[in-house]
Amino acid sequence: MFTKSERSSFKYWFAHWCAFQMTALNLKHWKPKYLLHDIEKPFLKLFWDYKKVQKWHRNHNSHHTEYKGQWDTYEMVIDWECSRFTKAEAQLNAYDTLVKMMRKEPDEKMRKKLYENIAPVLYDLNLCSLVGVNALYYNYIKNPN
């Protein structure tokens, strides 16, 4: 487990990379491209401080909601699901991460985008049931207040 202050280290990056690979394998959704998951981070860290690397990474990688193009929702969900294995402050699974994001998101369009793109992936990977998918819809889309 790593604290927030330790996340800029190579040791953390490698532990996260391993946890991501393990999670993708356990969910039976591993792809060869996942070998390159977050691969640029240790190299960028040689030139930039961690905050700049983090911002660049989130804006340029399709497994982050900050990415402006088409999201890679499976990689995103796997990333969320594995964070509890390496982040002391982020002990949520992928479903709970989505709930937290939807609860905090003030923009109705973004909540809808999150729901429409992520809920089917959670269900497909057996990370939530139809009851969980419906609960997301009723609590954060249909009746957000």
Could you describe each region identified by the protein language model?
Residues 1-145:
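Metal-dependent phosphohydrolase cores
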